[in-house]
Every structure is written in C-alpha cells, then in structure tokens.
C-alpha cells in the first residue's frame, strides 16, 4: 500500500492560526496561514495516517521523502469506477502514500495533465493537482502511510513531480495502464 505525506495541517482560514481537528481517533493540526492554498491544492493532515510504522519497500523512495509506485519497478495500479461520472474523476486507483516523517515536500501533477489527473490522500483524500506535506512529526516509525490515490479520466502512464529541499524529480506512475517496461495493472477499467 502507498501512503501520502503529512503536514502540520491543511488549508483553512486566513488568520494564520492553527486549529486541532479530530480525525480517526487522532488529532491533527491543520495550518491555516500564511501559505494559503490555491484552488486545486491540498495539504496532507499529518494526523490522518493509517500506519505510523509503515515500510517504504517495495515502493521507490524519491528524493528521500516519499515512497511511490514508480515504474518500471512497481506494477501499474489497477483502477475502478469512482462513481463521479465520465470526467477527470471517472476512475480511481486506490493506493496509499508513504512519507518520511519530519520532511517537507510537494507532489505536483504537471500542467499538461491537470485536466485529466488528480491526486489526494488523507481523510478524506481531496482530488488535487498539488499536495503539500509539511513536517509530519515522527510518532513511531520513520515512515507514515496515508489512504488515498489517483483519479483519472482514462488509464495512462502519468508523470508526477516530487519537489523537496530545492530539488525536483519527475516520476512516472501507471494508473490503469502500464508505463514502458512496467507490468500490466490488474483491475483496469477502460
């Protein structure tokens, strides 16, 4: 399972204050300022993890901060109908996001794909084009896992940009369709 990064919270008011929000038996602090979120962006709520002692393997660790189902080493993700009609949220590939605790990074859907791909993790995972993870505290293990995944209009090999510590790396993830050299996905819905 693949899980997402955490932040000290998710966007909210423009007051600059933080507020605790009870979720899944955990308390998460969601940042509300000064880094205001734009439309299409979300911040991972650190307390929404589903595993506080997650393992990065067999996923590929990218820039030392996040483990993703990157091709060709990981099979393409299977998809199912999301129930959200025929648009860009038509199919969903459920897979967790695994993040290294205490790190800050962004997951970004490149501009050419924003009309057909969204990403999101947490409770609930909000379909977004940019997910911010901001220094989720170490609460047991080095890696934290979050529920969520990828929404897409049609199966494809898609790019995702990871940005951390002044570095950026583009990776490719098979969402319902295999990337070159990647094993085929099970449970694909065209």
Predicted regions and their residues:
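Non-catalytic macromolecular-recognition regions in eukaryotic signaling proteins
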Residues: 8-190
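C-terminal motif of bacterial Sec signal peptides marking the signal peptidase cleavage site
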Residues: 3-5
